[in-house]
Amino acid sequence: MPKEKKIIDKTHLAFAVLLLTWVLTDTQRFGNIPLLTMFLIFLIYPKIRLGKFGKMELGLFLYSVYISIVTLLNIKTQLSGYEANSFLLLIEYFLCIFLAFILSSNVDILIFLKDIGFVGGMLSVFGIVEGVLRFPIYHYLLSGKLNIPDIGTNDYRIVIIFAYPIICGGFLIMFLICKLFFPIKNNLLNILLLVSIIEAILMNKSRSSWLAIAFLLILYLIKYTKFNLKINKKVVIYTIFIFFVLFFLKIIFNVDVVSNIASEIIDRFSGSLNAGEGQIIRIETVQNSFIYWKDNIRILLFGGGKNYDKVFLQMYPVIKGGGSFVWNGAIDNEYITIIHESGLVGLAFILFVFFTAIKRFITCDKCDKSSVCVNMAVIGWATVIYFYEGFNYPFIFLTIAILCSLSDRCVEKEQQKNEIN
């Protein structure tokens, strides 16, 4: 077997292992055990090539080391019943970073990202079916649970295989980015998959994802817009095709797609003003956090250890309706949670990682699609986890770690290329 084909085949297998991890996580029957399926990559790549961490990998590693130390020092302040979960998550952080390093050091990055985009498009097709039926088909088949809100109603939000709607939204953003930068050769299928991802994002109804798209679009325009009159033929053809489809839907089925989309977006954002809606809860938990930190400077600076946010929420729950609604389950903001757990010191490590992604996106060569793609994907995740605790889900931390590792490998390849030249 030619060496190049062998690398490509192994890359497909490596992505299949990652996909299996995502699928098994949604079963919700094995706790966090699905992460162990990632060790299958050692069957694909039995020879481990050790090397130095890149900047983003090092940032994640130092964050994991620091929060582990803080957790050990504050073990007595842990909320009863969360001790085991805290240490399990910390162990999984290190496993994710190690596995991401091994995977990124062996796969063909371009093929791996193309696999993400293609499979993401196929999953989005499944998501559209789910959205039409307003029933979590795949989630129910995998987990046997019907714990998704608003089943059978107009407010239903698709989850596909990702456990919760807001988590699904983050993955859909990553799929969209990979699909845009790494299309398949079949143009018609490529357009259908791209449209499917966009429709799935709309059916997912996650405001965090929509905001992430807006932010990424601004960054993209800053990097790529030259403000000239050069016309790209493909863009013109795709634009005409989209307008034709919209016109056809309006005339034949009397479906005004643009108006429907605008109405859906307005409804989702206006709904956040209702008491008890996620955004109102987030605002109050943030306000309460600042009140708490004023009297607890040590926690603000250094944190109280993994899951310390649960301790805080027991003291400062969000109460609505004179006590009829009490929320103390989660802060629903990863950055505020990081401060509670590891202080401004821990937050500095994570911000270093995400700002490195932004810097690389802005400074990398426009023709280096792999680097642009992975850094955009990291920025997308950095945006959506502002609205929930993504680091409490090992398969999300793993996915972010893989993207960070791929970004580091892209930098290394560029440096090697420059040394040769």
Predicted feature residues:
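Helix-loop-helix junctions and helix-breaking kinks within/between transmembrane helices
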Residues: W22-L35, E83-N85, A163-G169, I191-K226, ...
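Aromatic-anchored transmembrane helix interface
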Residues: G59-S68, L79-S104, K114-D115, G120
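Alpha-helical transmembrane segments of multi-pass inner-membrane proteins
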Residues: L113-L141, I160-K223
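A membrane-periplasm/extracellular boundary helix in multi-pass inner-membrane enzymes
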Residues: R134, Y224-L273, K294-N296
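Transmembrane alpha-helices of multi-pass inner-membrane enzymes
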Residues: M38-F42, L217-I218, V353, V372-N421
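Transmembrane signal-anchor hairpin modules in multi-pass inner-membrane enzymes, especially those
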Residues: M1-S80, L110, K114, F182-L188, ...
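Long extracytoplasmic/lumenal interhelical loops at the membrane interface
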Residues: L141-S143, L273-S342
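Hydrophobic transmembrane alpha-helices and their immediate junctions
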Residues: G54, L58, I184, L189, ...
